[in-house]
């Protein structure tokens, strides 16, 4: 692996601290009036998701983490996990639910997902930022609902995601959803 100096720290850089892969979320260079300059960074652990702050003296170096991303198509799921396929090599990768339970509600067959790999092992799966999903269940919008200030109602998508949608959305309609927040973005015209 390549070593990087504190002068090369930037947001988005993947580094290894104590044998664990981290993503730099924030980097502040501090030059006090007295003493040595240092970098105060906020990093997120790829394996646990925990965010911590670390301080490095100016000129120190750390190793970059062998974290890469690979685009793969979701094929199907079963009791054990989900199966993805590389569109170029047609290799299939089965990922157990314990690694991807947080995105289970966004799994839609024949959709491209980003698999995050560390030293060749899958450590996570990221869904597309926006997805178009069909509303499977929702209560009908009743005339006069807006008078009470209620403009959103609960709904369940065809993938099982529970979201809030405007009262004019009905079952069977396709909506665009932001998977980062789980929020409704817009109605998709057919």
UniProtKB/Swiss-Prot annotation:
Compartment annotation: Cytoplasm
GO cellular component: cytoplasm
GO annotation terms (biological process): peptide biosynthetic process
Keyword Flavoprotein annotated: no
UniProt keyword annotation of Protein biosynthesis present: yes
GO molecular function, one term: translation elongation factor activity
Pathway annotation: Protein biosynthesis; polypeptide chain elongation
Alphabetical UniProt keywords: Cytoplasm, Elongation factor, Protein biosynthesis
SUPFAM superfamilies, per the entry: Nucleic acid-binding proteins (SSF50249), Translation proteins SH3-like domain (SSF50104)
Function per UniProt: Involved in peptide bond synthesis. Stimulates efficient translation and peptide-bond synthesis on native or reconstituted 70S ribosomes in vitro. Probably functions indirectly by altering the affinity of the ribosome for aminoacyl-tRNA, thus increasing their reactivity as acceptors for peptidyl transferase.
Family statement: Belongs to the elongation factor P family.
Name the UniProt record assigns to this protein: Elongation factor P 2
Species annotation: Chlamydia caviae (strain ATCC VR-813 / DSM 19441 / 03DC25 / GPIC) (Chlamydophila caviae)
Lineage, uppermost ranks: Bacteria, Pseudomonadati, Chlamydiota, Chlamydiia, Chlamydiales
């Amino acid at each position: 692996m390549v070593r990087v100096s504190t002068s090369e720290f930037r947001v988005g850089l993947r580094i290894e601290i104590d044998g664990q892969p981290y993503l730099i979320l924030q980097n502040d260079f501090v030059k006090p009036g007295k003493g040595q300059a240092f970098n105060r960074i906020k990093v997120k652990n790829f394996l646990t998701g925990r965010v911590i702050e670390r301080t490095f003296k100016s000129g120190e170096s750390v190793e970059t983490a062998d974290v890469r991303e690979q685009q793969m198509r979701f094929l199907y799921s079963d009791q054990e996990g989900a199966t993805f396929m590389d569109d170029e090599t047609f290799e299939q990768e089965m990922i157990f639910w314990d690694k991807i339970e947080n995105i289970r509600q966004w799994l839609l067959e024949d959709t491209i997902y980003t698999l995050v790999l560390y030293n060749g092992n899958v450590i996570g799966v990221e869904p597309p930022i926006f997805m178009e999903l069909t509303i499977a269940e929702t209560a009908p919008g009743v005339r006069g609902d807006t008078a009470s200030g209620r403009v959103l109602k609960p709904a369940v998508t065809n993938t099982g995601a529970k979201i809030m949608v405007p009262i004019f959305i009905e079952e069977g309609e396709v909506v665009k959803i932001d998977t980062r927040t789980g929020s409704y973005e817009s109605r998709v015209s057919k």
